[in-house]
Design a protein with these regions (language model features):
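Charge-rich, intrinsically disordered regulatory segments
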Residues: 1-114, 121-124, 128, 466-483
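Flexible, glycine- and charge-enriched loops at secondary-structure boundaries
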Residues: 3, 153-160, 203-206, 311-318, ...
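Hydrophobic, well-ordered secondary-structure elements that form the walls
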Residues: 30, 366, 412
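Intrinsically disordered, low-complexity acidic/Ser/Thr-rich segments used as protein-protein interaction/activation
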Residues: 78-128, 132-295, 337-353, 381-390, ...
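C-terminal transactivation domains of fungal Zn(2)-Cys(6)
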Residues: 147-150, 273-379
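Residue position in alpha-helical solenoids
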Residues: 170, 216-219, 328, 369, ...
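Structural helix-adjacent loops and short alpha-helical linkers that scaffold large soluble proteins
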Residues: 202, 374-382, 419-428
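C-terminal region signature
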Residues: 404-409, 421-484
Length: 484
């Protein structure tokens, strides 16, 4: 027996504490002994000091994640080792702590949503190497976006590169093994978010992960068991499925087709049968607005794509959709909708949820006026909606995770695209900056940069009334804009 133990060797050599030659798919020792050879994800690090690799920090403002005791019941502490006995290096433990207390908080509109995500995902990832590596990569991307260059003395860029290489390999392996459970769906979605948080421009790899989720759901048979019976994971997956829907549906994703069996099947798999048939007018505790409104946004996107060459059909559908959204606004003004959430809301949270929902209604009106009625920014209906949104934003709790502010990317960007005077632009830039600090993701910085470029082009073209639609300019500028 050798005293030199391989840190990247197979399970059998590690169990026998001997040096492994790390040949794949079968190492030399296992091949000679005719034993089964298996490699698992190993959280290993070299002792070398990795040089900082030119991180982008010009836009970053370092903000620490909220203390865990600020979100009610704190997420479960991260263990020192994985269930299989592998010691968790301090660097990875730091990343998991930030994933739990920082990243998941920045995706949560309320502390109870944060608790749902932590209770469902954290225990599950400790047993799932592909989900664990995706979560670590998302955490690393989040820290990079906040201007950090190292974690426990190691370059975060190097961490992210290592996780992308090993983690995506694990994901491909799991896919070849025909795994189609909720952990696979969560893994693909978290890899999508990791690419979004990293703010990668060029090839939009996050779209590939969204398409992967769609393929998983479309290929799922209704009688198959997607869930594992873990109620905590099921609660987390309900939220993550709505995140998937919103990523597909919100504007400026014109190349992704949101309709199809994946949405209906996902609704059946992650929700009870009654909610799968009808969308509730209640405000969803994860989204910050109603699924009913999300459906309407999907219809607007679909009408824009399918009827662009048939103006009469487009106008008729626009009138129907306008009647629906105005009906929702009138109904909710008379009787404010309830919030679908597992905990009792404070008066402040109740107000913020209602304001967020109403802001999304007005932003949907703007999308309708702009995309289907082709109105310019200076038109009275659009400016009326802009002023309504700005007034409601002033009354919201701003810039905090575990609050509805985390959902504000779409309305802020929508209002920003219609801003055509200095005061409006300054107002929106201030709010987008607060969103960037709150979420800690480079995709928000991309949103800010895109708005400035849209405004510059309109000025260059002397388009002072906002006649040129921002979606045309974004396509020309080749931005990968994602809103959630």
């Amino acid at each position: 027996m050798t005293n030199h133990r391989s840190r990247r060797g197979c399970e059998e050599c590690r169990r026998r504490r001997r040096k492994c030659d790390e040949l794949k798919p079968t190492c030399g020792h296992c091949n000679a002994a005719n034993r089964s050879c298996r490699y698992e994800l190993r959280l290993v690090w070299s002792d070398r000091k990795v040089q900082h690799r030119g991180l982008r920090t010009t836009h970053c403002r370092l903000v620490q994640p909220p203390p865990l005791d600020s979100v009610g019941q704190s997420p479960a502490p991260i263990p020192d080792s994985l269930p299989n006995g592998v010691i968790l290096p301090r660097r990875y433990k730091k990343l998991l702590e930030y994933f739990s207390g920082g990243v998941l908080a920045s995706l949560s509109s309320h502390p109870s949503i944060h608790q749902d995500l932590c209770r469902g995902l954290i225990p599950k990832m400790l047993y799932s190497p592909h989900l664990l590596s995706a979560s670590l990569a998302l955490s690393a991307a989040g820290l990079l976006s906040r201007g950090l260059s190292e974690v426990e003395g190691t370059s975060i860029s190097y961490v992210l590169e290592h996780l992308q290489s090993s983690g995506l390999s694990l994901l491909r392996k799991a896919l070849t093994e025909q795994r189609k459970d909720e952990v696979m769906v969560a893994t693909c979605l978290i890899w999508c978010l990791a690419d979004v948080f990293a703010g990668i421009q060029g090839v939009p790899s996050w779209r590939i992960h969204l398409q992967g989720i769609k393929a998983l759901l479309d290929g799922h048979q209704p009688d198959d068991q997607l869930g594992t019976g873990d109620t905590a994971m099921e609660s987390a997956m309900r939220h993550l499925f709505l995140l998937y829907r919103s990523l597909q549906t919100l504007p400026y994703l014109q190349t992704i087709e949101p309709s199809g069996p994946s949405v209906d099947l996902g609704q059946t798999l992650f929700f009870d049968s009654s909610s799968a048939l009808t969308r509730s007018p209640k405000i969803d505790g994860f989204l910050g607005y109603s699924e009913e409104l999300l459906d309407l946004l999907q219809h607007i996107n679909s009408a824009t794509r399918n009827n662009s060459d048939h103006q009469f059909s487009l106008n008729a559908e626009a009138d129907i959709l306008l009647g629906k959204i105005n009906g929702m606004i009138s109904r909710d003004a008379k009787t404010p909708p309830e919030v679908s959430i597992s905990s009792t809301l404070s008066p402040q949270y109740s107000r913020d949820f209602l304001l967020c929902h109403q802001i999304f209604q007005q932003a949907t009106l703007i999308q309708l006026y702009r995309q289907l009625y082709m109105m310019p920014s200076a038109s009275r209906p659009i400016q009326s909606a802009v002023q309504a949104i700005n007034g409601m934003i002033q009354n919201m709790t701003q810039g905090q995770p575990c609050n509805t502010w985390v959902a504000m990317a779409m309305p802020l960007f929508t209002v920003g695209c219609e801003a055509f005077d200095g005061d409006q632009k300054d107002f929106i830039l201030d709010k987008v900056q607060k969103l960037e600090v709150c979420i800690g993701s480079l995709h928000v910085h991309t949103i800010k940069r895109a708005l400035k470029d849209v405004w510059k082009i309109r000025t260059d073209y002397q388009d002072f009334e906002g006649n040129i639609c921002a979606s045309q300019l974004l396509e020309k500028l080749q931005y990968n804009i994602i809103l959630f």
